Amino acid sequence: MKEIKHFISGELVGSASGKLFDNVSPANGQVIGRVHEAGRAEVDAAVRAARAALKGPWGKMTVAERAEILHRVADGITARFGEFLEARMPGHRQAEVAGQPHRHSARRANFKVFADLLKNVANEAFEMATPDGAGALNYGVRRPKGVIGVISPWNLPLLLMTWKVGPALACGNCVVVKPSEETPLTATLLGEVMQAAGVPAGVYNVVHGFGGDSAGAFLTEHPDVDAYTFTGETGTGETIMRAAAKGVRQVSLELGGKNAGIVFADCDMDKAIEGTLRSAFANCGQVCLGTERVYVERPIFDAFVARLKAGAEALKIGEPNDPEANFGPLISHKPREKVPSYYQQAVDDGATVVTGGGVPEMPAHLAGGAWVQPTIWTGLADDSAVVTEEIFGPCCHIRPFDSEEEAIELANSLPYGLASAIWTENVRRAHRVAGQIEAGIVWVNSWFLRDLRTAFGGSKQSGIGREGGVHSLEFYTELKNICVKL
């Protein structure tokens, strides 16, 4: 059984309190590791290590020198990718890629793309007139923001952690990572990769624990952290904002959503079915960008529901080392209790259960796992909690619509605005509808297609700020204007 420690100033460190918690396999419910829970002392040590590293070699390196090291980190991820999969779930044979075929390339790219981007970003400069006619020159320089608190989720642990750590380090910052208590080993393993790649001690630190009265709260309350980046539930994001307000620290928040898929009658049905199967059921529905609401134009509604049902029922539920399985368990027993409660709520609210709606029978050795069935409903009212609240499970409700205007109104009807997927072969309609959807990301005839140079983030209660490309540069650096009188 693994003992999972904190990674502070280049060393594996246990908790002074001796407090540990279980790391449990979602496939069978068995304890696979014991994790040290950070107290204030460990969090403070991690922040102090990061602050010291800012004043050390890392802070003195050129952009090109940091980029060279981060390229080695990317190569290290590739070399040990099997270990990263095993860290997420023992026996795992696939990447936690939400159905993406490029597997580990996105994790590598989170270091390589941002490292290279900074080598090619121009600084602004302006000449100005002065009363004496000599003029002055204004130019901007970017400096690291400082110590960044990175609070990352469990659903795509390596992808979403490196999405934040990569640009933060490329910009010259140092980080303290608080990974989800559900997936602790990934972050510590990345520390080993960092160390082997030549990242100086203290640049990358990891503390394990929970939210309130644990590592998460201690990190967000620490006065020497300069900014926070977080992916997770809206309520937790609000808590982090309140903590960061003391000291006026900046935050970047990618929060919850109840995303809508919109399927028009002129769509390519094969593409729409394949895309919606992914957006509803990939990673067992545990993707913040997934579409739990699907609106389908009435002329194709029945055919769409029938084909999506067939696709969902063709998914093979199985353990991680089953080469034929393409549908795994929820992350833990906490969502295993939450998701079926919504399954029951849907029935109570009068839904037609098209498929699923329960817990599958599993072999005895997997009976303790967090298994649920992929589920499709129709017939719910628009104000049902199943339609309005984020479930974060493998399920979707399908509702017909009769006009473009109605589809837009339905998609925008909730206080969330993270993502949406539109399926249509009419290019003008695609642009028109996409422009009216209140979401930070809108895909047309695709889903989860990401270019790291583009903006990523949510609107309304789905987040604050944008990361990706130059937007990450803006968040992870401070822009200073220097005015020189000529």
UniProtKB/Swiss-Prot annotation:
Q: What is its EC number?
A: 1.2.1.85
Q: Which family does it belong to?
A: Belongs to the aldehyde dehydrogenase family.
Q: Which domain of life is it from?
A: Bacteria
The record's keywords, sorted A to Z, are: Aromatic hydrocarbons catabolism, NAD, Oxidoreductase, Plasmid
Against SUPFAM superfamilies, the record matches this protein to: ALDH-like (SSF53720)
One molecular function GO term is: oxidoreductase activity, acting on the aldehyde or oxo group of donors, NAD or NADP as acceptor
What name does the UniProt record give this protein? 2-hydroxymuconic semialdehyde dehydrogenase
Q: Which reaction does it catalyse?
A: (2Z,4E)-2-hydroxy-6-oxohexa-2,4-dienoate + NAD(+) + H2O = (2Z,4E)-2-hydroxyhexa-2,4-dienedioate + NADH + 2 H(+)
Describe the pH profile of activity. Answer: Optimum pH is 8.3 for the oxidation of 2-hydroxymuconic semialdehyde, and 9.6 for that of benzaldehyde.
